[in-house]
């Protein structure tokens, strides 16, 4: 099983990928492909690497409890021919690391740290700690938190004293010294990751108004041990030639007592003021109420893209 994630090793995306497969497909350990960006992780589903290999799956972050939606991921779900097959909510715990050489310097203290490296979200999520404990340090953004850890591991403290904000896994991967744990400003920090694959690789199980809905691959349900319930994700463009268009779409879910778990807007990038709406709801199209609600949604929308019907791994099984 080949899975592409944002790297390098020790990233939260890698942690999410391993956690997902340990629950939904415990007999198959994934082979992780590390990429330099979220976009490249998805492109690996379609493009060969230097060894002529493509990935079967990609794991990407779509939403953080502090920062909200991950825009690049939402755009990729909309633009690429992929579907969601599972999701996982991963608790995010940031740590402050320095190299062991730095930690063992005589008289070393936080005041000596000149530069702090991390992903932009890592920096933002730890802004209170940075402002209070590292007020004179420069912050430098990296492609991922694990990339920050890798950079710090390679810097000679004789040249510059620097630190990284990253996961415990990244600290272990690059043999760094942890100075502080759980430095995020809000303790209940979590990120929603989704497992995606090419739509043409899925086994189609049902059509609604001519659009394909995809269920979990058979080997997930055969080997899985996690407690799951189904969710369905859509990307919708309302009809903009009449008032109350979005209300009428949402009314369809309310009429059939369908619980919505997320509504998120995203610019269409075509015309100012035109938006796609990402909608997640509990259930799958084989349920009578869901099927009837979806029929109305199709009637009342200018366009509907099915992003997937999939299992959500419950927190008590992670």
What are these regions (language model features)?
Residues 1-318:
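Domain-level signature for soluble enzymes in the chorismate/prephenate branch of the shikimate pathway
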């Amino acid at each position: 099983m080949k899975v592409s994630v944002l790297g390098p090793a020790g990233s939260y995306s890698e942690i999410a990928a391993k956690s997902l497969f340990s629950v939904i497909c415990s007999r198959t350990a994934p082979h992780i492909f590390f990429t330099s960006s979220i976009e490249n992780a998805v492109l690996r589903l379609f493009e060969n690497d230097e060894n002529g290999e493509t990935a079967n799956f990609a794991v990407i972050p779509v939403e953080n409890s502090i920062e909200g939606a991950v825009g690049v991921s939402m755009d990729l779900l909309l633009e690429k021919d992929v579907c969601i097959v599972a999701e996982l909510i991963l608790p995010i715990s940031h740590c402050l690391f320095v190299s062991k050489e730095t930690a063992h310097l005589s008289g070393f203290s936080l005041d000596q740290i000149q530069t702090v490296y991390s992903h932009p979200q890592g920096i933002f999520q730890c802004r209170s700690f940075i402002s209070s404990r590292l007020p004179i340090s420069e912050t430098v953004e990296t492609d991922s938190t694990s990339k920050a850890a890798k950079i710090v591991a390679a810097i000679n403290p004789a040249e510059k004293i620097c630190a990284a904000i990253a996961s415990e896994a990244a600290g272990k991967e690059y043999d760094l010294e942890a100075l502080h744990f759980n430095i995020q400003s809000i303790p209940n920090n979590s990120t929603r990751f989704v497992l995606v694959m090419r739509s043409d690789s899925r086994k189609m199980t049902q059509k609604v108004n001519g659009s394909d809905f995809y269920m979990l691959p058979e080997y997930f349900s055969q080997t899985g041990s996690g407690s799951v319930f189904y969710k369905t994700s859509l990307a919708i463009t309302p009809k903009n030639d009449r008032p109350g268009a979005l209300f009428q779409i949402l009314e369809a879910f309310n009429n059939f007592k369908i619980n919505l778990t997320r509504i998120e807007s995203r610019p269409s990038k075509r015309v100012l003021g035109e938006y796609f709406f990402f909608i997640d709801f509990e259930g799958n199209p084989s349920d009578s109420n869901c099927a009837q609600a979806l029929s109305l949604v199709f009637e009342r929308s200018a366009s509907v893209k099915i992003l997937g019907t999939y299992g959500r791994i419950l927190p008590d099984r992670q």
